[in-house]
Design a protein with these regions (language model features):
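Short amphipathic alpha-helices and their capping/turn segments at secondary-structure boundaries
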Residues: 49-60, 90-104, 179-195
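Metal-associated gating/positioning segment near the N- to mid-region
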Residues: 1-58, 130, 151-162
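Active-site mouth loops of central-metabolism enzymes
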Residues: 9-23, 78-96, 124, 141, ...
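Divalent metal-dependent hydrolysis catalytic cores, especially in the metallo-beta-lactamase
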Residues: 23-49, 63-74, 105-116, 145, ...
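Short helix-capping segments at alpha-helix termini
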Residues: 56-64, 141-143
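Active-site gating/metal-coordination segments in enzymes
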Residues: 77-133, 168-172
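N-terminal small/glycine-rich loop or linker at the start of catalytic domains
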Residues: 1-9, 67-83, 132-134, 209-210
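Active-site core of metal-dependent hydrolases
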Residues: 76, 117-211
């Protein structure tokens, strides 16, 4: 949840969990006022997302229906590691999924590549196909879908091979930080039936999209 006051998400992470919950409440109310009835919480620190979900369920706050992933699963030093769900290796991936399901996750978010977090490389895959498959298999066992943050081209291939349900960004980014569209990967995406969320608004101002 962004505060809407011009700060970046890195600056916002300096806030306490309590302040971030209050920011989330404000955002829920704004979405509802705009007529939005369902939104995703797509990776929140600690139990912030689950707290908002419980607040809505108990009628403490008003807002849209909230589908919460909770903490995104990431590798040591990986994108959004500050959310505090670190998993390295197949067994830790399974354990993280079980923990998140127990806490109330509606689906599982996995950081399959680096991103905007300082120290990570967006064009580098964060997990092996086997690690991703372990998380996907465990999530499906508990009737949960999976979403993977994939900026790196290699992370896209691995997510498809692992059976991930939804791919975020799908940037075809190389380790040299250059975009190189690969038709063979696009064909894999089509044949697998994986859902794609290109998140265009993350990189382009909304007015620019309209124009």
């Amino acid at each position: 949840s962004l505060a809407g006051d011009g700060r970046t998400y890195v600056e916002m992470f300096a806030d306490s969990d309590e302040m971030m919950v209050l920011t989330g409440v404000m955002n829920l109310q704004q979405h509802l006022a705009a007529g939005i009835t369902t939104i995703r919480e797509h990776g929140a620190r600690n139990k912030i997302g689950f707290t908002l979900k419980k607040g809505l369920a108990r009628g403490y706050i008003a807002g849209p229906r909230l589908l919460a992933s909770g903490r995104p699963i990431t590798c040591t030093g990986g994108h959004f590691h500050m959310c505090n769900e670190i998993a390295d290796g197949e067994e830790q991936m399974r354990r993280s999924v079980r923990k998140l399901v127990h806490e109330g996750a509606d689906y599982i978010k996995i950081m399959a590549s680096g991103g905007g977090t300082e120290g990570t490389i967006p064009g580098l895959a964060s997990y092996t196909t086997e690690e991703l498959h372990a998380a996907v298999h465990e999530a499906h066992h508990f009737h949960r879908l999976t979403a993977a943050h994939c900026r790196a081209k290699e992370s896209m291939v691995r997510a498809i091979e692992a059976g991930v349900d939804l791919m975020e960004h799908a940037e075809f980014l190389e380790t040299d930080d250059q975009l190189h569209f690969d038709p063979s990967i696009a064909e894999m995406m089509e044949e697998s039936g994986i859902w794609i969320s290109p998140t265009l608004q993350s990189w382009t101002h909304y007015q620019g999209l309209l124009s």
